[in-house]
């Protein structure tokens, strides 16, 4: 099972942080259209259950905690202009224990970094834990996103 090597996180220090490209969209709100992902990876019940087990040891999804109702993505397929249509998914996560989550001043996904020539298909996920000397604590509003896609209106390029 996915979790067995990782269960020591729950018995380790409370200030644990687990982050990276986990390739799991935690909920349907983390993909542009849940219907487009039926039968695909990243959204299966088994994957989501494994992620929920990891979070159950006391880890907070700090980006979703900061932007609970916002459409924020960290990955867009290169094919079919998915980025420019904002047809993405949020599969890059920062999960933090209580002491770290309490220090989060700002958390966001830098969509601008995904633009330009030769970018990664992922955008950086950034968390500010402390206020900078100049008072900067990151964006107070999430980067603008397109409106929610009508369910079933778009297909994945590989579908």
Regions found by a protein language model. Name each.
Residues 27-159:
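Metal-dependent phosphoester-hydrolase catalytic domains
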Residues 12-14, 57-58:
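Structured helix-beta-strand junction loops
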Residues 13-28, 32:
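Acidic/histidine-rich, metal-coordinating catalytic segments
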Residues 1-13:
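A long, amphipathic alpha-helix that forms part
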């Amino acid at each position: 099972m996915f979790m067995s090597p990782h269960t020591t996180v729950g018995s380790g220090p409370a200030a644990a942080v687990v982050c990276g490209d986990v390739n799991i969209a935690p909920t349907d709100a983390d993909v542009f259209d849940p219907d487009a992902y039926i039968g695909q990876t990243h959204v299966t019940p088994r994957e989501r259950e494994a992620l929920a087990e990891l979070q159950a040891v006391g880890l907070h999804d700090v980006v979703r905690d900061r932007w609970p109702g916002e459409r924020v993505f960290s990955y867009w397929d290169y094919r079919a202009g998915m980025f420019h249509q904002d047809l993405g998914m949020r599969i890059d996560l920062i999960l933090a224990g209580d002491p770290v989550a309490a220090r989060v001043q700002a958390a966001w996904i830098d969509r601008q970094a995904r633009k330009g020539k030769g970018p990664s298909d992922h955008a950086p996920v950034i968390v500010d834990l402390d206020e900078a000397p100049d008072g900067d604590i990151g964006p107070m509003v999430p980067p603008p996103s397109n409106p929610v896609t009508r369910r079933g209106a778009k297909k994945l390029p590989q579908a």
